[in-house]
């Protein structure tokens, strides 16, 4: 068989279709539904991964992207076609790689639902989501894009609501549904503005707008920018449109949470990339300033709110907001460089954002899989009820630790590389003659450094409170390692974190066609893709780093204590005893740090933002000097939820109650409403 994208992509889609069909066929046979639905998904994702890798590797020598027509149509303006250009192949790789790891993981994870939930339904909707997401990043027509975008959103809603018997799950599902459709409405209006300018819905036609002076000078372009920023920004989870994300991700099944955080929100990043750098043309300065400001605010607030969480999956959800902000910082810097006539530096900043996109997909998927393994073993998301899991789940602890190091941007793993590239792109603003760049880029760089430091602190908390010390509940004490396929899915992403961290030059080398497509420049003039990353920016000033060299040095340094042990070990005696307990009779779990206590200094420093509320309940025996129990609770305010969304919700409900009078139950009245609406639309069209 010829292993080309034209052959492998249809095989991937067939795999997802068969996986969906198997889930529905074996609704009453949960073991068969699990095996075949997620088994076919694994095979389909593997074919998709290979197809996208081959497409990226060959795009440098291919003059035209692969185009396939999925279905014939006679509907005007509608084409069911896909185009696998370098941008689609890059995001297709993200979708397929995560889908492969998650499908493997799901083979073991879904066993936890046996006897409780219908695994066939889970597998069917999971495959639909994979297929729709793959088509979203490859669609070549706005109508087709919106169709598969909506299928993706609805299947994700069904999966978020999978455990719908829980009130918090139903509430999160409705919130996601509403926010998703508001975003879809904004995207639809943006496409209508592009249709008005081109007379068609094909992406190739939208691309021609960048060469039309009348479009570049029109107000419609700015309106389209704002609509797309809002629509795709909701899906990506940017502040202040993020409110659905920390609600939906924790309640979804963990394989779905990993896909939503690792992939689904990246479809918003795909949309922003396609629109900003492919459709709308050279940006005005305020576009870049807006995107950079939103990215910076999202990064800082995301990590601050993450530090306040003791729900492990909710903590990871807020970190998704943080990392989306880091991606947008790269995009904002790129737009500003394009406006000031620095296409090479714009390419560097864009690559920083795109590389962080795939890095975040990999390490955040890994972390959610680790959190799912912990939930599978302990049946709780509350870190206060965990502890001591590294001894009981050593493989899961190791995988989670790799993800924690990667997301903390520590060398030599992948998170360090993309954040280093982001720092380098922001530092180039110092050499610019534009005063706005010299003002904003240092501020952005400083806040990015703050974000990285807080992220590292947060994952010291997450790993330490979850996996170290003594168990703080019976569930944690009785935890066990998860099935092999769950570990295998995590292992795939561990390998990806290591590869993207140690060998970034191998991957960056194949992205030249992608940057050529979006900015007209290649990476080669900026980065010497040899034994390390060597940046040669303004006046040849820049930084040099080699993550592979760091890794080799780290391994070499390990041999020093080993050599000392070999030399001196014969002369010393080893004694094994209990952990030092500060002179007390014995350590108990009540003496350990809690997640709430660990983050208290940050809560106090930023109390103007968090507005913490503390509740202390004491019970006494016979005197106020002899307390029998003390209960302490701390709550922080999510400022956007309490100050914006809840008042807005009350306003909408109040208006809805007043408009109920229109629902008279009369067919004649409804026909009059339709007639009046039709007249208004005709008048608008004149």
Regions found by a protein language model. Name each.
Residues 1-10, 21-124, 197-215, 575-577:
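Transmembrane helix-loop-helix hairpins at membrane boundaries of multipass inner-membrane proteins
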Residues 2-7, 81-88, 141-143, 211-218, ...:
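Interfacial loop-to-helix junctions that mark the boundaries of transmembrane helices
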Residues 20-24, 104, 303, 462, ...:
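Alpha-helical transmembrane segments
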Residues 39-56, 181-192, 400-412, 489-513:
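Hydrophobic alpha-helical membrane-insertion segments
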Residues 62-76, 202-213, 421-434, 506-541:
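Membrane-interfacial helical/loop segments at transmembrane boundaries in membrane proteins
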Residues 81-96, 216-232, 436-452, 530-559:
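Hydrophobic alpha-helical transmembrane segments
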Residues 101-145, 157-481:
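Hydrophobic transmembrane alpha-helices and their helix-loop junctions in integral membrane proteins
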Residues 506-556, 564-686:
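Aromatic-capped, Gly/Pro-kinked transmembrane alpha-helices
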């Amino acid at each position: 068989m010829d292993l080309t994208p034209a052959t492998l992509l249809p095989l991937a889609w067939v795999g997802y279709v068969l996986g969906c069909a198997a889930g529905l066929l074996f609704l009453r046979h949960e073991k068969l539904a699990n095996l075949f639905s997620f088994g076919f998904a694994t095979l389909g994702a593997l074919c998709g991964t290979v197809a996208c890798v081959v497409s990226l590797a060959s795009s440098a020598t291919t003059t035209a992207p692969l185009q396939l027509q999925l279905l014939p149509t006679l509907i005007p303006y509608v084409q069911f076609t896909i185009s696998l250009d370098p941008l689609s192949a890059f995001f297709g790789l993200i979708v397929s790689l995560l889908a492969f790891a998650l499908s493997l993981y799901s083979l073991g994870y879904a066993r936890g639902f046996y006897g409780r939930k219908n695994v066939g339904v889970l597998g069917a909707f999971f495959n639909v989501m994979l297929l729709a997401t793959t088509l979203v990043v490859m669609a070549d027509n706005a109508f087709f894009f919106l169709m598969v975008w909506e299928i993706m959103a609805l299947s994700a809603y069904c999966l978020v609501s999978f455990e719908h018997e829980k009130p918090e799950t139903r509430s999160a599902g409705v919130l996601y549904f509403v926010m998703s459709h508001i975003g879809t409405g904004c995207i639809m209006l943006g496409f209508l503005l592009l249709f008005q300018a081109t007379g068609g819905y094909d992406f190739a036609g939208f691309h021609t707008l960048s060469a039309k002076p009348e479009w570049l000078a029109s107000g419609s372009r700015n309106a389209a920018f704002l609509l797309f920023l809002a629509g795709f920004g909701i899906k990506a989870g940017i502040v202040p449109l993020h409110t659905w994300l920390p609600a939906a991700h924790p309640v979804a099944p963990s394989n779905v949470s990993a896909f939503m955080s690792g992939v689904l929100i990246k479809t918003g990043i795909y949309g922003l990339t396609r629109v900003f750098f492919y459709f709308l043309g050279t940006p005005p300065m305020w576009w870049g300033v807006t995107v950079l400001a939103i990215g910076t605010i999202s990064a800082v607030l995301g990590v601050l709110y993450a530090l306040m969480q003791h729900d492990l999956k909710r903590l990871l959800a807020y970190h998704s907001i943080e990392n989306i902000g880091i991606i947008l910082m790269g995009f904002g810097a790129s737009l500003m460089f394009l406006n000031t006539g620095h296409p090479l530096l714009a390419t560097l900043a864009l690559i920083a954002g795109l590389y962080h996109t795939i890095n975040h997909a990999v390490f955040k998927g890994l972390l959610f899989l680790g959190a799912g393994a912990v939930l599978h073993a302990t049946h709780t998301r509350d870190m206060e009820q965990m502890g001591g899991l590294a001894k009981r789940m050593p493989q899961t602890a190791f995988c989670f630790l790799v993800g924690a190091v990667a997301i903390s941007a520590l060398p030599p793993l992948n998170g360090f590389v993309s954040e280093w590239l982001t720092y380098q792109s922001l530092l180039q603003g110092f050499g610019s003659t534009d005063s706005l760049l010299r003002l904003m880029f240092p501020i952005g760089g400083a806040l990015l450094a703050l974000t990285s430091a807080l992220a590292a602190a947060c994952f010291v908390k997450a790993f330490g409170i979850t996996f170290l010390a003594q168990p703080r509940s019976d569930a944690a004490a009785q935890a066990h390692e998860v099935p092999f396929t769950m570990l295998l899915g995590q292992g795939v992403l561990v390998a990806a974190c290591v590869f993207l961290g140690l060998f970034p030059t191998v991957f960056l080398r194949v992205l030249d066609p992608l940057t050529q497509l979006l900015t007209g420049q290649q990476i080669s003039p900026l980065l010497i893709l040899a034994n390390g990353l060597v940046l040669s920016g303004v006046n040849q000033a820049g930084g040099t780093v080699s993550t592979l060299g760091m890794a080799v040095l780290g391994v070499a340094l390990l041999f020093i204590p080993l050599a000392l042990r070999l030399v001196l070990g014969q002369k010393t005696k080893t004694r094994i005893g209990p952990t030092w307990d500060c002179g007390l009779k014995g350590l108990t779990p009540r003496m350990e740090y809690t997640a709430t206590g660990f983050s208290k200094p940050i809560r106090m420093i930023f109390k103007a933002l968090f507005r913490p509320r503390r509740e202390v309940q004491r019970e006494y025996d016979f005197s106020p000097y002899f307390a029998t129990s003390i209960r302490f609770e701390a709550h922080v305010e999510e400022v956007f939820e309490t100050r914006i969304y809840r008042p807005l919700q009350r306003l909408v409900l109040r208006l809805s109650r007043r408009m109920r009078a229109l629902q008279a139950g009369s067919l004649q009245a409804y026909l009059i409403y339709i007639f009046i609406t039709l007249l208004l639309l005709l008048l608008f069209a004149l």
